Amino acid sequence: MIQPISFGYSSVLKSEWRKGKLPSVVKDVYGQILEDVTIEHLIPKSLGGKSNICNYALANKLTNEARSNKPLMEFTTKENLIAWFLQFVDVKTEKFDGNEYIKNATKYLAKNGIKLDVWG
């Protein structure tokens, strides 16, 4: 039997959220309540973004599709980004460390011109 090919992205971020292991994470990177969840590239691949966790966030499918490959800051605000990351402070599972995610993702965003002061 031929298996269908999936071009969707998966990551520990999405799988841990779906398993209910990230209960503090209720809003997506755009400030919307998480429902039909997809992996969002913070920096789109077409703009040089990588496919790794430091460039991943969770987003509702419709917003992700509407954004497509447009720059992140055309679809969200620094306040929404900071609120997104604050949901992960001190969150730790067997497979995911929220503080490391914040550190690495904000460093990656800074390298791409988006500077955030998450820690205040």
Place the predicted regions along the sequence by residue:
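Acidic, low-complexity intrinsically disordered regions
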Residues: 13, 80-84, 115
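Histidine-centered nuclease catalytic patch
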Residues: 3-56
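Polybasic, low-complexity binding patches
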Residues: 43-57, 65-107
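Zinc-coordinating Cys/His ligand positions in small cysteine/histidine-rich zinc-finger domains
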Residues: 60
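A boundary/linker detector
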Residues: 1-12, 99-102, 113, 117-120
